[in-house]
Amino acid sequence: MKKFILALAALATSALAISQPHTHDGFFLNLTLGMSYQNFGYEYKATRYEGMTIEGDGISLDADTKIGGCVAPNLALHLTITEVQNLSDLELKDEHERTVATTNQSESLILFGFGATYYFLDNMFVTGSFGLSVFTIEEVGNSRAGGASEAGIGFQVGVGKEWWAGDEWGMGVLGTLTYGSADDKDDIGEMSAYAVGVKFTLTLN
C-alpha cells in the first residue's frame, strides 16, 4: 500500500510538472461540496408489509471526490466517490401514503463509480459517472446503530462552470442529478433515491 501511495504521488507530481497553465491536461482532482434535495424511498417486498413504505424527502449534504487524469485535451477519466447525506428523519407510511410513525433515523446514498468529465473552451463542463450504490441508515447521534444495503446500481450526471484561480486550480459551481437503488440485506425491500444538487467545485488540473 505504501508503494502504491508513493507511486500515485510521483505520477501526480510528474503530471503537474508537464501540465501547461490554464489547460485541462495531466493529473485531475475534483472536490465538490454543497446541498441537494433528496427523495428516498424504501418499498417492502415481503407480503406481511405489502403496501408499506419508508420515505425521507428533504435537504441533504452532497459531496464528491473525483481523481484520475486527462486522456485527451479537455477530457478526464476518473474514479468517483459521492455521498448524499439526508438530513430528514425517515417516516413509515401505510398503503394510503399516511404517516404512521417517524423514526430517529437518517439515510445516506453512497456511489462508487467510474466517470468522465469534459471541458468546453469557456470552461463550461459536463460530467458523468456510473457504478455501485450503497445505502446506509443510522440513528441520529449514534453512528453505531443502523445498517447498510446490498450493493446496487447508481449514476451521477452534472453540468457546471469553473473559473481559473491559478495556473492549475479552478473554482466554480456544479449542478448534479444523482440516483441509486439497492436491495436491503434481509431481502424484504428495495431502496432507491434521487438527489438534485448545487455544489461548489475545486479542481486541480
Language-model region placement:
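N-terminal signal peptide c-region/cleavage motif recognized by signal peptidases
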Residues: 12-14
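Outer-membrane beta-barrel translocator domains and adjoining extracellular loop/strand segments
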Residues: 41-49, 89-100, 136-149, 183-192
